[in-house]
Amino acid sequence: MKKYIISIDQGTTSTRAILFDQQQNILAVSQEEIHNSFPQPGWVEQDANEIWLSTLSCLSSLFLKSGAQPDEVASIGITNQRETTVVWNKKTGMPIHNAIVWQSRQTAAIVERYKKMGVEPLIKEKTGLVLDPYFSATKIRWILEEKNIQNTEDLLFGTIDTWLVWKMTNGKVHVTDVTNASRTLLLNIQNYWNCLIFLKTCFLKSSILPVLSAILIRFIFSILPVRSEPWSVINKALCLDNLVFTKEKSKTLTEPAAFY
């Protein structure tokens, strides 16, 4: 009988997982710290494999603590740090570089290059975002240039949600949702995925991108016989939780930084 729900919170400083029963009681909680590296001032990177292993460890810990069985889990919800960028080889499953974290400024020179090309107004019109190192597209470009990669045929890109689902499905599913895609500089908000102008500017092929999926979708996990229930990023999920539905209301998250 499917009687449990798991929530995964993959954040900047830690990975957490919570097991709930049908009455929304918390049966078990697990958390593991995530390490950040700082190769240069303003640069922030993480080991994408460590992120995955910490998630797997947290899930295993829930079952050990609660006595629940994987086949009793009805669904898994995922919330994650956005913008953080992973590029990996789809044949080996290995990242080609550390994940570049959302707050990293290491793509500043690339951003300035594109601003000088005069593409920022059009990109803002198409994506709703300004050109800034914060967002994922320039992080992808930085990784490819750092590794001197011209052919991206065997490569995949994902934010952390995409990376975790891809790992959970043994490479069978490469997807993301609107809440994550909207922070990549690659989502055309007028007709959704993808922003061709920036793909061309960054010399990226659309084959590297995950499929933009509806928020309600079912996946059969290879490691757990359950479905991945709608994942959403922390900020937007908190707005729903606190009934922030009008322009007069707002919600602020203050960990690990302040998000409005």
Regions found by a protein language model. Give the residues of each.
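Structured, active/binding-site neighborhoods that engage oxygen-rich ligands
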Residues: G118
